[in-house]
Amino acid sequence: MSFMDQIPGGGNYPKLPVECLPNFPIQPSLTFRGRNDSHKLKNFISEIMLNMSMISWPNDASRIVYCRRHLLNPAAQWANDFVQEQGILEITFDTFIQGLYQHFYKPPDINKIFNAITQLSEAKLGIERLNQRFRKIWDRMPPDFMTEKAAIMTYTRLLTKETYNIVRMHKPETLKDAMEEAYQTTALTERFFPGFELDADGDTIIGATTHLQEEYDSDYDSEDNLTQNRYVHTVRTRRSYNKPMSNHRNRRNNNASREECIKNRLCFYCKKEGHRLNECRARKAVLTDLELESKDQQTLFIKTLPIVHYIAIPEMDNTAEKTIKIQNTKVKTLFDSGSPTSFIRRDIVELLKYEIYETPPLRFRGFVATKSAVTSEAVTIDLKINDLQITLAAYILDNMDYQLLIGNPILRRYPKILHTVLNTRESPDSLKPKTYRSETVNNVRTYSAGNRGNPRNIKLSFAPTILEATDPKSAGNRGNPRNTKLSLAPTILEATDPKSAGNRGDSRTKTLSLATTTPAAIDPLTTLDNPGSTQSTFAQFPIPEEASILEEDGKYSNVVSTIQSVEPNATDHSNKDTFCTLPVWLQQKYREIIRNDLPPRPADINNIPVKHDIEIKPGARLPRLQPYHVTEKNEQEINKIVQKLLDNKFIVPSKSPCSSPVVLVPKKDGTFRLCVDYRTLNKATISDPFPLPRIDNLLSRIGNAQIFTTLDLHSGYHQIPMEPKDRYKTAFVTPSGKYEYTVMPFGLVNAPSTFARYMADTFRDLRFVNVYLDDILIFSESPEEHWKHLDTVLERLKNENLIVKKKKCKFASEETEFLGYSIGIQKIAPLQHKCAAIRDFPTPKTVKQAQRFLGMINYYRRFIPNCSKIAQPIQLFICDKSQWTEKQDKAIEKLKAALCNSPVLVPFNNKANYRLTTDASKDGIGAVLEEVDNKNKLVGVVGYFSKSLESAQKNYPAGELELLGIIKALHHFRYMLHGKHFTLRTDHISLLSLQNKNEPARRVQRWLDDLATYDFTLEYLAGPKNVVADAISRAIYTITPETSRPIDTESWKSYYKSDPLCSAVLIHMKELTQHNVTPEDMSAFRSYQKKLELSETFRKNYSLEDEMIYYQDRLVVPIKQQNAVMRLYHDHTLFGGHFGVTVTLAKISPIYYWPKLQHSIIQYIRTCVQCQLIKSHRPRLHGLLQPLPIAEGRWLDISMDFVTGLPPTSNNLNMILVVVDRFSKRAHFIATRKTLDATQLIDLLFRYIFSYHGFPRTITSDRDVRMTADKYQELTKRLGIKSTMSSANHPQTDGQSERTIQTLNRLLRAYVSTNIQNWHVYLPQIEFVYNSTPTRTLGKSPFEIDLGYLPNTPAIKSDDEVNARSFTAVELAKHLKALTIQTKEQLEHAQIEMETNNNQRRKPLLLNIGDHVLVHRDAYFKKGAYMKVQQIYVGPFRVVKKINDNAYELDLNSHKKKHRVINVQFLKSLYTVQTRTQRINQSAPLRELREHTKLLHS
C-alpha cells in the first residue's frame, strides 16, 4: 500500500516521486476539521506554516501532502477534491492554502465579539487572565475593522480605575504596549501592597519585608542567641500611589536619556522644550488626577515590623560618619544601621541637580524629636565608596544635621560598607568588643505585658559573657554551620520586684537570662497612629528613665530605649525561639524533626503507608496545556523555585503526556510561591471528600488546660509521596521544561482529604491533641503532663518522618494562637490583629464587600450576642431587599464594637456545671450557654447563639415559639450538652407543663421526642430576669400612623418676615419695614420686589385681609409651613389618603397658594416613603376599549364587586362589598363575610343602597356565583333592574368597580398596615376620604356631584373659611341641574378621550357567526401539571353569537358553570385551507371537557 493510499479519504492521487512523499510524523494536536471556525482556521494555518518553515522541502507537492495529513473530514474531503481537480503537480502550496482559507473562512460576528469583550474586566479576572482572554477574543476581529487607537481604548476600558490612570500616563502607542504597561503596573501593586519602601537600588518600590527575606533564607536567623531584634517601618498607603512608582527614571526616559535631556534642555517627563520637570503641565495633570482619586482611599499609618540585624558584624557600632564624594562634591554622610531608609538634604539635591520624583507621603520621627515630619519626594543617587559602586534611593528632607544618611537597607545589602568606613575612621583597637563594668542602676521602670503602666524597681547587674553564634556566610551548606564566638553584654539581670512580695514589704529577686531573651535594639521610629494600644513583647524587661552604661574608656553611652512596642497579641515575627524552653532531653531527642529547613526527599519516603493517588473519571481527558506567558523577571523566579524543588528531589524532569501551566503568586514578604494550575486535572478527577473537623468541637476539648504547644508542619503536603503510577498526571510545564512531582503538590482537589485523613489516623486516639490539617495544638493541665504529651506527639511525627517548622511553633506557653483564636487558661478570644482588621474594614459599598465583611464576622460570631439580629440589615442588602441606609451603617458599627471590646469565652469543661438560657420572640430566637459553679454562680460564658425566624415560624403560638428556640439552641450546643446533665432555663411557664400534655400537635410531639434525648432540669426564669437571651431575641419596632393637627393659620404671621414672597409683598404694601430673609433666599426676594414694582397684574393678585396675605382669594403659605399643608392633605388619615399629584393638587390649590405649588407637591410625593411602599406600577390595558353607555343620572347605573383576601376581624368580617355610582363616582364600602350568599347580598343592597338612593336601572358586575344565583336574577327582574355581567376572564367590563377597588386597597395599606386585624374600624374614614377627593375625570369630588355641595371639614381652623354651602331649595335645584349637565359633558369627553388613547395601537378582531377560532388556555382552564410544555391554544371552536365587537359566544359545552361568552383578547382566528375547512364542518368541534382533562391530567 502506498503512502497516499494510507491518507484517510484519499487514495486517488497521482503517483508522486519519492522526494514528494515526506516522512515527517503527524502532530495530533495540529489538526483542522473545517467546522467553519475562522479562529481555528487561522491558528491552524499559522501553526502549519511555522512548522514547515523549519524543514527544507523539495517541492510544493510535498508541502501540500504534509498539510493534507493534518486535515480531518470534511476538510480532508475538500482537500482530496481540490487536489484531484487541480492536479497536485500543477498547483502551488500558496494556491492550496488560499483555497483552504476561502472555502472554510467564515466572517466573524462583530456583535458576538464585542459582547464577549464586555464580559471581561480586570476586577473579575486579574490582569494576566484579562490579557490572555482579550488577546484571544481580539484576534478574531477582522484585521481592518478597527484602528490601533480604538483597540487601545477598548482594552483600557476593561481595567480598574487605578490601572487605567497609570496606563494613560504612559500613553501607549500599540495594544501590546498597553497590555504590557497594565501587566507591569498591576504586578508591582499585587506584589508589594500594602507595605512598601524605596529599594536600595532606587529603581523600584519594594515591600518593606522584602529586605527581611534575604536574611530569613539563611540559617543564622534560627539561632536566637545571636539574633538582635531590630525594627523597620512600613508605610501602608493609598493604593493609587502604589502604581505610578515603578521605575521612574526608565519610564520617563523611554525616548531620551537623562544626559540627552540635560544637553538639549528637555523636560524629563514629556521630553519637550521650554520648561523643566517641576513646571511640566502634563505631569501635574496626571499627578492631580491621581491625588484626587486617592483622597477617599485608605489613610496612612505606620506599623512596626521586626527584622533581624545583620549579625555578621555584631561587634561593630550602629553608626559611623564619613565625608564622601558625589560628582566631585564632598558630602558629609552618616551611616546608620538603625535607620529604616535613607535620607538626603534638599540643598545637596539642588546643588547636584538631581531629578526629583513624587512618592507616597512618609511620616517619621527620630530619637529625640517631639514632632513628626512628612516627606513625599525622593531622588536616586549613584555613589562610589572605595571600589564599591552603589545606587540607592533617598527621601528628601529640608533640615538634617548630615547632608546624607545611608540607612539599614543599604548597609544590609552591602555589609562591607561599615567595615570600610570604620577601618578608615578608627584604629583597630576600637573594633574590639566592648565590655561593661559591673554596675547597678536604680530607679528603673519595667513594663509587663499585662500592665504597661505599673513601674517596678529593679536592680540591674551587668557582666560579660561569651555566646556561640552561627555565621551563615562561612557555612559550606545549610547543614554544616561554622561556629564563631562573639562578645555581647549584658546577659544577667537581677530584678527586685516589690509587687511580687505582696504587701508585706519584703522583696523577691528574679533572675532573667538574656541568653534566650535578647533585648530589642534601639528603634528610631515611634508608632504614631495608635500609640496607646501597644505593649511590650518582653515581659518584665527594664526600661530606664535616664539610665547610662559606663564603658571602658570612661565615657557614658546614653540609653534611649530598650524595648520596641508592637501591637498586642500580634504574631511574633522576631522568631523568638521557644524550643530552648523545653527540657534538654526533649530538645536532644527531637532536634532532627524540629528545624527551619525542609531536608531533601528521603530515599525511603515510599515506605510511608500513605500515598496520594489520582483516579480519573471514565472518559475524561487529561490536561495538555501550554505554559502561560510570563515576563523575563518572572521566568527567572520560576527557574529558581524549580531548581530548589529539583535539589530537594520533590520534582523530577518528566516525559508525561500531561501538562498543566504554572503561575507565580506573590507572598506578603515579597517572595513568590509557585502554583500549578490543576483546574483541568481536578475536573477529570474523581473526588474523595473527607470532612475536616469542626473548629467548635476542637475548642470544646480544651477544658482546664494550663499549658499549650502549637506545631506547624513544614510544607506538609510535600512530606507525603505520590503514588508512582500517578506521578505523570502531576506534570507541569514552565517556559524552560516539563517536570512532575514525586511528592503531593498543592492544588490537587483531593490533597486536603489525603492529608487530613493521614493526620486523623495518626492522632485519632490522643485526646490531648487537636489537629486541623497541618496545625497541631497540644494542651495539658500541668508542665509534667505536657512533657509527656509532647513526647508522645513528637514521637509519632518522628516515626512518620514528618518535619516541624521550628520558627512557626510555640512551645509550652500559657497562651497561644490556634486557627484564628487566642487560647489561654480559661480563655478563648479572637485575635486582636484580626479584630483590628475587622475594625478598620471600610464601609461596604457593594454586595461583594458586604459579603466579605459578614464572612469575617461569621468566623467570630460565637463571641457576639445577637449576631444574626444585628446583621439582618446587612443580609437584606445582600439579598437585594434593601438599599444601603443608616440601618446598615449602624449594624456595621455594632458588630465592630461587639467584637473589638475584647470578648472572652471560657472553654468547655466536661466536668463543670452548665446552664442554658433560651428565649424567643417574633423577630428571632437566642440562647446563651454559661458555666456555673456548685453554688450556681456564673463562672463565664461558653458561647452565644442567635437565629432569625422564617416567615412561617413567625406565626407559631408563643408556647411553640419558645419550644422552637430551645430545640434550635440544643441542636447548636449538642456536641457539648448531649449526654451531660445541665439546667435549661426559659421565661415561658407554659413550657413546664408541655411534657404532661395529653395530645400535643405533631410538630410539638416531634420536638418533645428530641428533648427526651437530653438530661436536663427545666427551670422557670421570670421574663425581667432573662436579660441576655431576651436581648438576643427581641427587638421592638413601632410604626405610628401619620397624623397632623389642624392648621392654625394665625401662626403663619410670624413666618412672614423670613419668607421672600411674603416679606416682599408686605414691604411693598408698607406693612413691613425690615425683613429676615436668609442669604440663600435673597435672590428670590429681590426678584419678587422687582415684579411688584414693574407688573401691575402681579400686584393686583395679592391682598391683605385680617393681617393675612391672599393670592386671588387663596391663602399664601410661607415656605416653612408648606410641608405642613402638604402633610395634611397627603399624609393625614382623614384628609389625605396618600393620593397622587393630581388629586393632592386638587385638594390644596383651591385654598392655598405658594410659588411653584405643583412642583413642590411633585417633589413631596416623590419622596413620600409610604407611597413608595404601597403603590405599584399600573400596567397598560390590552384589547380594544368598548365603553359602557354614559350614566343618565345619580344612582341610576351602579356597579358592584367584592374585595377579598382580608384578615378576619374580631367580628369575623373578611370581605368588603363595593358599590359605585357610575355617574357621580360616589362609592359605599360595606364590610361583610365570605360566606355571604345571594339572599344576604340582597339584604345588604336594600339596607345600604336602595334605602338611601332608590332602585337603579342597571347593575354592572362580574360573574360571581352570588350574582348568577336564581334568587338574585329573579329579584332584579321583578324590580326592573337590568343585570349586566362581564364576559369570562374579563374584569375590565366592570372597570369602574375594579378601579375603585384598586384605590380602596391602597388606602387600606396606608391606614391599617400596623393594625391589620382592625381594618373594618378604618373603613368609614376611608369611604369619607374617597368620596371627598376630586376625581381626575370630573374635576370635582363624588360628594359634590352627588349632593351638590361639599361636606364641611374641620381641617381649617378659621371662622371665615367654610366648605359646606347653604342653598335654598330653588338654588339647590338649579345647581344640581347645572352639575348634571356639566357632568354628562365631562363624562362624554373623558370617554371619547379614553377610547381614543387606548385604541390607537389596537387592532380590532372582527368575527362572523360560523367562523372557527382558537381559545387561549387561560380563558377557562386552571393551570395543571407541566403547563410549560402544553399547547397555548385549544380548539377549534365555532362562533355561534356576536355579543358586541369585544365578546363572542362560542360553541362550548353547556354543562360548564362558566359562561360561553369569551372576550376577544383570548381568541385567535383559525386560518385554514379549503380542504381543512370542509373537514372541520363535517365533524363536531373539540369539546371543552376533553381539552380540560387533557390539560389537567397530562
Curated annotation (Swiss-Prot):
Name assigned to this protein: Transposon Ty3-I Gag-Pol polyprotein
Every Integrase catalytic domain range: 1185-1350
PANTHER family given in the database record: PROTEIN CBG26694 (PTHR37984), PROTEIN NYNRIN-LIKE (PTHR37984:SF5)
Residues that bind Mg(2+) 1: D712, D774, D775
Disordered, as annotated region: 470-490
Source organism per UniProt: Saccharomyces cerevisiae (strain ATCC 204508 / S288c) (Baker's yeast)
Residues flagged as site, Cleavage: G207, A208, H233, T234, H309, Y310, N442, N443, S561, T562, Y1037, T1038, S1063, A1064
Zinc finger (CCHC-type): 265-282
Locations listed in the record: Cytoplasm; Nucleus
Subunit structure: The protease is a homodimer, whose active site consists of two apposed aspartic acid residues.
Domain RNase H Ty3/gyspy-type, first and last residues per copy: 919-1037
Catalysed conversion reaction: DNA(n) + a 2'-deoxyribonucleoside 5'-triphosphate = DNA(n+1) + diphosphate; Endonucleolytic cleavage to 5'-phosphomonoester
Lineage of source species: Eukaryota, Fungi, Dikarya, Ascomycota, Saccharomycotina
Function: Capsid protein (CA) is the structural component of the virus-like particle (VLP), forming the shell that encapsulates the genomic RNA-nucleocapsid complex.
Positions of the UniProt region annotated as Integrase-type zinc finger-like: 1132-1171
Domain Reverse transcriptase as annotated: residue spans: 646-823
